[in-house]
């Protein structure tokens, strides 16, 4: 089993990086005689599948039931983990991980007994899913603000919350040793990701 994931604060280039590495990782998989699956971005998919009929936007959902959304994401990552376990010869490339769910669960917070249950359930699911991730590539902030693309909620523009978000992600490398903190340069990131995956597939 080989599961490689991109993680990091909003607006740090994960989606761009995923697009940039698609072709070289596909070629790399062929070189190693493996198939590769680029898993769908969970944030938008989960919102549209489970919440879009009741909420106009993610921002509306986060104002009403932020941990309900994070719980749905944790459940989706758990499903991904089970899929990876059943297909050990496939290389999985994931946009975000359970680490991201943990960060945003803490960042968004909650109140009341129902949210306490959701938090317990979220971390139970993450415990079951994170152990299948072989390596995390962590994107660092570029020093700017997160791009507003019509999906990211407004609280990402709050400087205090933004600083807290970035601080939380900076500790992932301490908590999970199989982490590579990526450089800022676009080409350098591609080279680091492809090179590291190539070496890990030989292990």
Question: How would you describe each model-predicted region?
Answer:
Residues 20:
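Active-site signature of alpha/beta-hydrolase-fold catalytic machinery across serine-
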Residues 67-130:
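Glycine-rich phosphate-binding loop used to anchor ATP phosphates in small-molecule kinases
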Residues 14:
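Conserved lysine of the Walker
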Residues 23-76:
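Conserved substrate/cofactor phosphate-moiety recognition/catalytic segment
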């Amino acid at each position: 089993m080989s599961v490689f994931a991109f993680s990091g604060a909003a607006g740090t280039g994960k989606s761009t990086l995923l697009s940039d590495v698609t072709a070289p990782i596909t070629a790399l998989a062929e070189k190693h005689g493996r198939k590769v699956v680029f898993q769908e971005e969970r944030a938008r998919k989960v919102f549209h599948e489970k919440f879009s009929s009741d909420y106009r936007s993610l921002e509306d959902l986060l104002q009403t039931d932020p941990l309900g959304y994070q719980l749905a994401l944790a459940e989706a990552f758990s499903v991904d983990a089970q899929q990876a376990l059943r297909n050990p010869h496939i290389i999985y490339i994931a946009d975000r991980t359970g680490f991201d769910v943990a960060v945003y669960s803490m960042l968004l917070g909650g109140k009341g007994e129902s949210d306490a249950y959701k938090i317990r359930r979220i971390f139970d699911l993450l415990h079951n899913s994170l152990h299948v991730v072989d390596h995390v590539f962590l994107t660092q902030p570029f020093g700017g603000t997160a791009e507003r693309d019509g999906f990211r909620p407004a609280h990402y523009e709050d400087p205090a919350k933004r600083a807290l978000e970035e601080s939380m992600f900076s500790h992932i490398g301490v908590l999970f040793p199989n982490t590579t903190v990526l450089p800022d340069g676009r080409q350098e990131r591609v080279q680091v990701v492809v090179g590291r995956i190539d070496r890990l597939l030989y292990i």
